[in-house]
Amino acid sequence: MQMRMTRNMELQKNKVLLGLSGGVDSATAALLLKEKGYDVTGFYFDVMGGNENGRAEAEVVAAQIGIPLIYENVSEDFHRVVIENFVSEYRCGRTPNPCIICNPNIKFRRLLRHADEIGASYIATGHYCRILYDEANDAYYIRRAANDKKDQSYMLYRLGQDVLSRLIFPLGEFLSKEETREIARKSHLSNAEKKDSQEICFID
């Protein structure tokens, strides 16, 4: 099987919608895309509704980078699709992973929808992951990030071809989180030293 890395940022000059959380990973991903000539728009989706702090952080970062930001309250669908499943699994004695449910059903669905609305050819996130393209089968596959300690490919295995064929992971080749932070520092981003989130996104 002949496989090659796809989404070569040096060759692509298209509009992209990037999931912007307000954290350093997605902010750095936006910076990298802009440096490569992409026309970047940020997208912040509020999973619980009324998360003014999270929204404000995303707005500050978007302003610092110089990109527009789209906001959407997805709390109703998130509760129905993700939280209800989470509670049900716990009641059955299983340990659920809400990201595995959210990514294909909420996060990337919304990214694609808004990308189409603004005419963006691609979507992107700050995940540590890579994509491979199999020419023989004309199919895209998730690949582990170069940084094994930060790899997030296991949370994205349920994404379909409609998503993978338009998806860019700017941080996939990074070997350490320090590389990410250093880029943010050089650009004087306010979130350059922001700690990584260790909690489930809907549990404070």
Where do the PLM segments sit?
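ATP-dependent adenylation/nucleotidyltransferase module used to activate substrates
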Residues: 3-158, 168, 176-186
